[in-house]
């Protein structure tokens, strides 16, 4: 599999930016809006956006159950920000009727970093990614409060991060990766390259 076909859930969020990042990272990228399109892809990116709205859209577009089934069957997935929330097994501070995918054994606190005006940037050390620290952009972002035994912690907010210091902001469980930040907006392709490598290896 030289250039895997990776879908980007095209309901909300930075869809174009993720498509460009995946194409730059060695994948052929395509937007996903219909259940039948899930059958053709080798991996899926779930972009940022508003997680409760995205969960409603997944149901409206009849994608929720087919996507859960594909994830259970081992479809590699990467979620950023709201995508991380949707991939979690437990979500704090969300609507009681919000649906999620449960692909990573973790508890996520929605909007943990505060409102849009509280958005910030930080340099992170990211497990499995070499080179300079990764510049991470957090926009009304979640953080991870608990991970299961099979979940690998990839990045935390550094000690210089104030009240958020030490918070978990990137994880991996098997072939599923999630970050609370938005690598698609910085031009740093290393998270997308890591994910494309995971897709190739499955």
From Swiss-Prot:
Catalytically driven reaction(s): aldehydo-D-ribose 5-phosphate + D-glyceraldehyde 3-phosphate + L-glutamine = pyridoxal 5'-phosphate + L-glutamate + phosphate + 3 H2O + H(+); L-glutamine + H2O = L-glutamate + NH4(+)
Gene Ontology cellular component terms for the protein in this record: cytosol; glutaminase complex
Pfam families per the UniProt record, alphabetical: SNO
Positions with a binding annotation for L-glutamine: 49-51, 110, 139-140
Highest rank taxon of the organism: Bacteria
Keyword line: Glutamine amidotransferase, Hydrolase, Lyase, Pyridoxal phosphate
Molecular-function annotations in GO: glutaminase activity; pyridoxal 5'-phosphate synthase (glutamine hydrolysing) activity
Active-site positions on this chain: 81 (nucleophile), 182 (charge relay system), 184 (charge relay system)
EC number: 4.3.3.6, 3.5.1.2
Pathway: Cofactor biosynthesis; pyridoxal 5'-phosphate biosynthesis
Stored HAMAP family: PdxT (MF_01615)
Family assignment from sequence similarity: Belongs to the glutaminase PdxT/SNO family.
Function description: Catalyzes the hydrolysis of glutamine to glutamate and ammonia as part of the biosynthesis of pyridoxal 5'-phosphate. The resulting ammonia molecule is channeled to the active site of PdxS.
Listed name of the protein: Pyridoxal 5'-phosphate synthase subunit PdxT
Source organism: Rhodococcus opacus (strain B4)
Gene: pdxT
């Amino acid at each position: 599999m030289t250039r895997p076909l990776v879908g980007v859930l095209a309901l909300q969020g930075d869809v174009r930016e993720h498509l460009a990042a995946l194409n730059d990272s060695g994948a052929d990228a395509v937007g996903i809006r219909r259940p039948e399109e899930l059958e053709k892809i080798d991996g899926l990116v779930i972009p940022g956006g508003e997680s409760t709205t995205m969960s409603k859209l997944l149901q409206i577009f009849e994608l929720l159950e087919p996507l859960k089934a594909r994830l259970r069957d081992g479809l590699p997935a990467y979620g950023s920000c709201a995508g991380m929330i949707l991939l979690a097994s437990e979500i704090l501070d969300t609507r009681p009727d919000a649906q999620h995918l449960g692909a990573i054994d973790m508890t996520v606190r929605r909007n943990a970093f505060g409102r849009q005006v509280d958005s910030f940037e930080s340099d992170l050390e990211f497990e499995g990614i070499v080179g300079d620290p990764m510049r991470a952009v957090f926009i009304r972002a979640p953080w991870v409060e608990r991970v299961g035994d099979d979940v690998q912690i990839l990045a935390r907010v550094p000690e210089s991060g104030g009240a958020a210091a030490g918070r978990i902001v990137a994880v991996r469980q098997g072939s599923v990766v999630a970050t609370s930040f938005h690598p698609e907006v910085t031009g740093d392709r290393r998270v997308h390259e890591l994910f494309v490598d995971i897709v190739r290896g499955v």
